[in-house]
Amino acid sequence: MAQVYSQEVYVQYLKRYGFVFQSSELYNGLANSWDFGPLGAVLKQQIKTALYNFFIKNKRDVLLIDTPIILNEQIWKASGHLANFTDALVDCKSCKLRFRVDHLDEQIKSATQWNPKQVNCPNCKANNWSEVRDFNLLFQTEIGVVNSEKRLVYLRPETAQGIFINFKQLLQLKKRPLPFGVAQFGKSFRNEVTPGNFLFRVREFEQFEMEWFCNPQASLSVFESQQQAIAHFLFKVLQLNPALVKQYEYDKNELAHYANKTVDFLFQFPHGLRELWGLADRGTFDLEQHQKYAKKPLDFFDGENNEHFIPAVVEPSVGIERLFYALIVSSYQQEQLEGEMREVLRLPFHLCPEQIVVLPLVNKLKETAQTLFEALSQTHWRIGFESAGSIGKRYRKADAIGTKFAITFDFESLEDQAVTIRERDSLKQVRVPIKELKAWFAQHDDQSH
């Protein structure tokens, strides 16, 4: 298995190079809140672009929508979130810390399985627990200006419900057959009582969710198709290390209240093997619930078989921050090179925040190298320019932030109009004429995945 470092290694690395840092740091921070810096914001955007290109772009049976964070509060009643979206928590009476029951014992799938006599507090080692209590994870807020007219609403805990409530409109808009998918990117919010483990569990996060509407008899076929698609995306597009990923199918007694079948793609994060991407057969639960509460029909008419039915839903759901974190863990390595520690981020070329960097060998060549940088900046590639420091230190920085190719503009370049290209992973160097650079990079672009 590839080496997985401690969480602190990744936190410090990402902060050092401006990928991710503590949010509100000027005011001593806010727990479990993170800002994406210049490199992190670009990498996050490239992950979203890769998701869009693979799952949505040019797919005749997939639609992309964008719905609000605040929805009619009745939606959360219909979906079951008001009643069921809770964590079972206990307090250690000795040290006053609060824990999720399922985090104290991973064998526990429901609060009814909790046996306090068998578990000691991980902080103070005492065995002095409070009663189990359920805490709802929905963030509450109000809309309205006048106090007497204010209305209680919730920040969405998932993007899925915004898709379900638009099913009929999308169906009528396109008159499309089943199955078809609807995708959405967007922020979601969960009032996690015990968030933590860096980007893995935060209160505000971005999701990519798809809802595949299908005939209930075809849901297994759709499920298996999406399972294969997720695996392809993780291993071929993001190029995650397969040794760090495991698929886990839930037993019947582990399933969420809405699910008929669930498979999680688990990833070896620093704190353990945890969920990266969930795939669930939600059955007909969602549309039936919204039909019941809205009192409006959400059925589908199958003209070929002359029958009406409520479609089943198959849902792939992933958090962008978790994908980001997994990509860093899978790609980041520390190794010895020429007696020094080399940090390298082995990202696929299409994901690199900075794909190519232009490096003048010395300051005297800076102006001419700048002309080359400006020419390459007219292409679709993400180009950087670095002139400060020795060429060796600039190579090290480029490796650390994942830059795939470094172009060195030296004194010979003035004479032969060629430059040296150094490849990040193999460290091989090749001399390429400047006039052929665009063609050379086009040949080495992995965008065709």
UniProtKB/Swiss-Prot annotation:
Gene (UniProt): glyQS
Enzyme class per UniProt: ligase
Top-level taxon in the UniProt lineage: Bacteria
PANTHER family in UniProt: DNA POLYMERASE SUBUNIT GAMMA-2, MITOCHONDRIAL (PTHR10745:SF8), GLYCYL-TRNA SYNTHETASE/DNA POLYMERASE SUBUNIT GAMMA-2 (PTHR10745)
Catalysed reaction, written as an equation: tRNA(Gly) + glycine + ATP = glycyl-tRNA(Gly) + AMP + diphosphate
Protein name in UniProt: Glycine--tRNA ligase
Gene3D superfamilies: Anticodon-binding domain, Bira Bifunctional Protein, Domain 2
Binding site for ATP: 190-192, 200-205, 275-276, 319-322
Residues the entry annotates as binding substrate: R100, E158, F205, E206, Q207, F208, E209, E315, P316, S317, V318, G319
One CC-aspect GO term: cytoplasm
Subunit structure: Homodimer.
Presence of keyword Nucleotide-binding: yes
General function of this protein: Catalyzes the attachment of glycine to tRNA(Gly).
EC number of the protein: 6.1.1.14
Keyword Glycoprotein recorded: no
GO biological process, one term: glycyl-tRNA aminoacylation
Entry-linked PROSITE patterns: AA_TRNA_LIGASE_II
GO MF term (any one): protein dimerization activity
Family: Belongs to the class-II aminoacyl-tRNA synthetase family.
Alphabetically ordered keywords of this record: Aminoacyl-tRNA synthetase, ATP-binding, Cytoplasm, Ligase, Nucleotide-binding, Protein biosynthesis
Major site of localization recorded for this protein: cytoplasm
Subcellular localization, as worded in the UniProt entry: Cytoplasm
